[in-house]
């Protein structure tokens, strides 16, 4: 899907949201989440439930999403909660690099194999990455997301080059089959 079409699609979806929602327990409850102070980014983070939680808990946090509508929801909630949140409107499927490094990188419910092979370029050496994406096994119970947005069994670990796996699980979570990886960026 081209950048403009993807943005319009996500803008229409997020136009129905008035609040950011809850943080992702995969991140918020993880024993591998470093203590603040640290920099953090939530990639394809939508309305920012996890990003706002990170910001409220002392992390210098950035939220990246293709949808300005989603980012506006997050910015309004950050203002209401009096937390500092940087937002960046960016298409992760584009060839443009983000141009920053973070201590913690979160990327959930987004799948682009080309992007994942370059994810290490966003993480400081020794930094932590949290990646969660539905697998093709999910199609056994659900027709969406469609096949092109799903990872094959074992594929995610292979795509995340430059990371030492701290945790890797592929299983059913709340009736959704996902691959979940927490990794530490290798020090060159």
What does each model-found stretch correspond to?
Residues 127-138:
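Conserved beta-strand signature within the Rossmann-like core of class I S-adenosyl-L-methionine
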Residues 97-104:
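A short acidic, Gly/Pro-enriched loop at the edge of an enzyme's catalytic core
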Residues 81-92:
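Conserved SAM-binding strand-loop segment of SAM-dependent methyltransferases
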Residues 67-69:
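Conserved SAM/SAH-binding beta-strand->alpha-helix loop
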Residues 1-35, 37-46:
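Conserved class I S-adenosyl-L-methionine
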Residues 111-123:
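A short, conserved alpha-helix within the catalytic core of class I
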Residues 171-188:
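Core SAM-dependent methyltransferase catalytic element
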């Amino acid at each position: 899907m081209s950048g403009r079409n993807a943005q319009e699609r996500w803008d229409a979806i997020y136009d129905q949201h008035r609040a950011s929602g809850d943080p992702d327990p995969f991140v918020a409850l993880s024993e591998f989440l470093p203590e603040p102070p640290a920099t953090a980014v939530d990639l394809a983070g939508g309305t920012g439930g996890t990003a706002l939680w990170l910001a409220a808990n002392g992390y210098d946090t950035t939220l990246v999403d293709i949808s300005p509508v989603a980012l506006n929801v997050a910015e309004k909630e950050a203002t209401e909660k009096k937390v500092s949140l940087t937002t960046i409107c960016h298409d992760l499927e584009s060839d443009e690099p983000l141009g920053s490094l973070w201590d913690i990188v979160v990327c959930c419910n987004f799948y682009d194999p080309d992007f994942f092979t370059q994810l290490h370029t966003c993480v400081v050496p020794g930094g932590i990455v949290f990646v969660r994406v539905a697998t093709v096994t999910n199609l056994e119970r659900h027709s969406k997301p469609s096949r092109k947005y799903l990872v094959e069994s074992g594929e995610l670990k292979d795509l995340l080059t430059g990371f030492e796996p701290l945790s890797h699980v592929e299983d059913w979570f709340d009736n959704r089959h996902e691959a979940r990886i927490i990794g530490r960026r290798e020090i060159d």
